[in-house]
């Protein structure tokens, strides 16, 4: 829905009925405030029922705090006719978005949660508008105004929390990359690293057969960051090789990555399987090691 159609839903300040619409909106806000606990419980239930990925026990308290904070903000604004550009997102909402980003829960889940919640709140608004002591025409005008206002609020708050979510996701990815790089370095230089610790920190088991590879972009622009491209290539190669699990990928620089594949016994090293991936990226080069097992094999396949 574009901003023009949303704006048409909101009552114009110059409209003859503007003052009365805003008064009735405030009345609706007061009545919704009296039902705060009911609305809060209903909105949480709607989100939890529709989105299993947000129901991890340690995330539920943060979800509930975010929902409560958003409801309080919305009702405060419509009861007091406060413009959107005069409000800040609640701490609970931004903290929840940050945590979802760090957990690598998709941004689409956060966006959907806001739409589930806003739809639920709109249903309560509709109930209260129906109970207003005014003409049906004015009730419809109030409902249109509230609907347009809610769409503007959701558009604003989702843009805010999605930015926070991306910052959290990026921070977590950088932290994980640092941990993985440190563990790989320890193994390659022969430090005493237990297989259990390595698997816990990197998600990759040292006991299985490994096939190491070096990926790089030949003559890459030093100013271009090819990290995401190399990570995508690593995953694509894992699929082509028939690997049962995701590869372990550590970034050396902006155009180079070291990768270990959990190689199946019947992995396909034919040039066709490799070239099918290489040819999609200009300048991409792949150097494969030999398939070897265990901690020593992890090192030997790389070197």
Cite the ranges covered by each PLM segment:
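Alpha-helical/coil-rich non-catalytic "connector" segments in signaling and regulatory proteins
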Residues: 1-182, 201, 243-245, 281
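Hydrophobic helix-rich structural segments at or within alpha/beta enzyme and signaling domains
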Residues: 174-303
């Amino acid at each position: 829905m574009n901003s023009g159609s949303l704006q048409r839903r909101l009552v114009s300040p110059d409209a003859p009925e503007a003052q009365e619409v805003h008064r009735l909106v405030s009345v609706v806000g007061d009545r919704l405030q009296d039902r705060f606990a009911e609305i809060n419980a209903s909105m949480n239930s709607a989100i939890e029922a529709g989105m299993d990925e947000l129901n991890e026990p340690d995330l539920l308290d943060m979800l509930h705090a975010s929902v409560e904070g958003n409801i309080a903000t919305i009702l405060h604004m419509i009861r007091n006719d406060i413009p959107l550009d005069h409000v800040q997102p609640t701490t609970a909402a931004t903290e929840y978005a940050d945590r979802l980003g760090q957990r690598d829960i998709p941004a689409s889940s956060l966006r959907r949660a806001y739409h589930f919640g806003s739809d639920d709140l709109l249903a309560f608004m509709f109930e209260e508008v129906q109970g207003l002591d005014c003409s049906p025409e004015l009730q419809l005008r109030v409902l249109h105004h509230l609907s347009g206002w809610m769409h503007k609020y959701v558009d604003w708050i989702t843009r805010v929390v999605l930015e926070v979510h991306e910052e959290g996701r990026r921070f977590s990815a950088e932290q994980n990359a640092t941990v993985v790089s440190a563990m790989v370095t320890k193994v390659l230089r022969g430090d005493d690293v237990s297989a259990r610790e390595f698997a816990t920190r990197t998600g990759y088991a040292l006991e299985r057969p490994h096939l190491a590879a070096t990926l790089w972009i030949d003559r890459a622009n030093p100013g271009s960051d090819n990290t995401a491209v190399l990570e995508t290539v690593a995953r694509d190669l894992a699929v082509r090789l028939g690997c049962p699990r995701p590869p372990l990928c550590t970034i050396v620089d902006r155009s180079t990555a070291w990768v270990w594949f959990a190689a199946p016994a019947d992995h396909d090293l034919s040039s066709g399987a490799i070239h099918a991936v290489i040819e999609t990226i200009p300048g991409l080069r792949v150097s494969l090691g030999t398939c070897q097992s265990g901690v020593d094999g992890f090192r030997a396949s790389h070197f």
